[in-house]
Amino acid sequence: MLVGIDVGSKGSCNLMAACGTINSTFSLYTSATTKNGDGDRKFNAMQEVTLKVVEGYATRNKAPPKEMIIFLNASPGDQINLYQENYCRKLQENIKKAYNNHEVQLTVVMVNLRNSERFFTAENNPRNVAPGTLVSSTIVSKNYDFFIISQQSNKGSIVPNHYKVIMSESKLEEGHLQELIFSQCFNYVNWLGSIKIPAILMYARKCARFSAEVMNGMDVSSGLQSRLYYV
């Protein structure tokens, strides 16, 4: 199961949304929103929307997912240890409580979209590197992190995404996870080609913003939760 989590706001309406896949081909989805906040309220909101999309998966498949890969829209200053303690580990505990001690293999990836790094081709007339370029050595930390450029641009310089894997229980090797991330940038229904971020995270962003800006925080009917009504 793939899950994306992002936030959206308009005025005093500040929402968090999650979107999750509910089939093996990553083509069917469920979504959920809740009020967002700061500190503990933010992590509680993350738990709430994640558990809601897990419930959507379990309803369709008669069982919760065995493995989850979760993408979080993060900021450069976000502290990894807070997310590990207040989100990752608590999520596993909550899933165990809700589903009869069910253990889920969890991989959580923080996605930083705002970076100062830029990458160019090594030639006399430097250009943006091609989509699919991976940078996983030299300028990255000793932790599990890497840069991926997934989109094409002919104007200006491309801002790469910085992916930080803060929990990894998946059987996926590092290279396979990177391939999955890049392939998911082609899975967005409203664009021909690749987008900047994995589609599941873009759907979460669209859901949060639509719910805040158009729905003003109102809940949608249960029948719409399995539809991409916000795209």
Enumerate the predicted regions with their spans.
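Long, contiguous domain-sized segments
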Residues: 1-231
